[in-house]
Amino acid sequence: MDIQTFISNQASERQSILTKIHNTILENDKSVEAVIEPMMGNEMIIYKAKNSMKYGLASVKNYMSLHLLPIYGSQPLHAKYQALLPKASFQKGCINFKDEAEMPIDIVQQLICDCAPIDLVKIREDYLKAKKAKK
């Protein structure tokens, strides 16, 4: 399935915000490519950098979710956007929302711009090198 088919298969009231978030991710983080893949039992749009998931965009029964691995590892980023998006529901590495009122696209754009420079693969490689050096 391609991205447009995935979005068009969602409830009509969700299609606009899903499209806006999808485009915002691709426009503001040039390191990622989008694919449809299963995660946590559901197909979603997975945005991969260096063949590793960086973001995910899902639409499930009662809400939509923007998964952001950069905020999972950054408490300051998590706290910043939790304050900027008070109507959304924050988890460790994702933001659940029901509509654009809970997830204004201008704030999403700032969020992706803050996440874009974070190289998760390099962070992991550096961690593993440091761990190996301690042995």
Q: Can you describe what each PLM-predicted range is?
A:
Residues 1-135:
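Charge-dense, helix-prone N-terminal extensions
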